[in-house]
């Protein structure tokens, strides 16, 4: 078996997660064309170092194809990042990217007492 990337939370105050589904037309594009659009997205993400981004495939686990998560201490930076990404070419190939779930980081030991 191949090695899988392990995503380790950075313990920033806010975690924003949402599923997304790409349109069929996305998969009909050449790999090179898709990569060019994703490179634009990635470049935009690098402009916001206060926001960590992780994308994971989830096809077959639920209705969505992928999940994306953002960790930040500055929700205003997340909003600026998403606003900029929504005007890029890859956005035209997104069929659905809701619901958006926003969480505040809590250590597990602090929340497990709620379930006793």
What annotation goes with each model-predicted range?
Residues 15-21, 60-85:
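Short, well-ordered beta-strand segments in beta-rich or mixed alpha/beta enzyme
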